């Protein structure tokens, strides 16, 4: 295909298609596709003004230039323009004009062809009429070149066509779009390698082998007749790599499918083969290409020094065994010591050559060792076409017994000599999953203690055990504690008791002989108070009401004799009362929580009432005290304002009798005033309430408080009757009678 001249490009510019939408660089007019209305208008204007007035025609068309109007008319709308297929007469005319004007004057050629442009004539010549253009079917070699070039160049068909002499860019493009592209996308296209490149690769491989001092011996073709028949399921190296000589004979001798099949077998054969399992060869190019750095040095693969298989299948072994047959080959073996001596010696001396070892167990040189190991993974290569390198039996014997291992950048002894803490612990205290051994003394439930004795000393019987750390687990008592134990004896733990505070108070009383008032200081922190019972809350509110709010308290007046008789025991009795009260107030089962008053009488008739703040004197206790004093003397009549009672049995002996006594008084709406003729009298006096010291006798209760406290009100009496009725029904059959006590 000839090159196009500058004149052809200028000629094509005159007939350029303007249907594209690319804007013009000089003007702002946009190239838009021509519409049918514009085509009709252009035809009318050309018919009116002629083909020379393109400026006037363009002025009548919106957004159209003179060049656009001319190109549209000459290429599309001209009535004499022929767009159909080329006739035989036209082809002959083009061939004749090309011989006359050449391939660079397409404008002159187009003028002599009615209805054809220069571009049409040029394309017709280069694509069809040129005798250099190949019209035969595409070959596999051309397909391979097109595929490889398209991967690099893309859709630059002119440059791809230069690689294929006789093929035009248009033909290459059409062939790619119609055939090759579909095969590549579906994966059915196999890249076929050129035979010339394969031969060149084989020659370069053989030259590299010679540079590395590798000795390759070729066997004559006649020896192939002695090769035993191989199994059908084993791939033979002779089928994988056919020599060029054999391939040329088959191509020249055979015709049709025979030559094509032979070529396909040779061209599609892969370059690298790996030995897998025992007798199978598989392609290993994927493995090597994935990690080329690790596979670059094949000399790092070891198959074992004692393996005789590698010696039998190696090229060195073939050289030794075939030496008598190949008489024209002379081998020389240079030793490393000989080379070192040559460097030290003078020039012109003879080179000592060591004889070839005749024994089959001779050690080949290091260069041949590397070549032997490399030959295991690569297919054998031959120099001339009429020889086969190895037989099937030798190929089978080349199979290694173990898988090749890459060279490691570290030493395995690093892992063998390294022991972690977990490994040492597992060795010293193994899990009991089998029959226990005598040397193992640890139990499963016993906590693990690290034994610092080496493992060698544990298993040895004649080595004295290391008792250096034997005493670490024994607890040592400090010297001051030892002296204290010798002097006072061992400590005895006290039994836990819920009344530890009361026990300490009793110890203090017994040892000191005095009674102390222990007042607990309130803590600054907010303490959680236990919920009080309803009875305790009622009693506390009534007591505070009597002390703080009642405007008319009554005072208790006692004769001097009685007061003098009671003074000596006031302090001691009050201390005991305070101690008992402080202890009882903290107990859940105290006297106040039981709902009745505990009376503790003494020699001086001191009465204590359970309360949390004040000590109040009950009228019932005073009456009881008066009755006890009357027992020592004669019976004195007990006078009231309403009458005189001389019988001592009328004195209330309990709260129940006092309740009955006050009930009769309340019924008559008169509060009695108790008078005594002998010892003392009790009178309600209207005086101001005085704050007495805690050591003085507290003030007596008022009449209103006593009425409510002893259940003298109407609602309380009603509740008492109902309660007694219920109790009588409930405990009707019980032998013991219980009294209801209301406080």
From Swiss-Prot:
Component of the DREAM complex. One of its GO terms (biological process) is positive regulation of transcription by RNA polymerase II. Signal peptide: none annotated. Residues 9-22 have a biased composition (Acidic residues). Keywords: DNA-binding, Nucleus, Repeat, Transcription, Transcription regulation. It is found in: Nucleus. This is Myb-related protein B. Residues 54-77, 106-129, 157-180 bind DNA. Residues 26-77, 78-133, 134-184 form the HTH myb-type domain. One of its GO terms (molecular function) is RNA polymerase II cis-regulatory region sequence-specific DNA binding. It holds the Pfam family Cmyb_C.
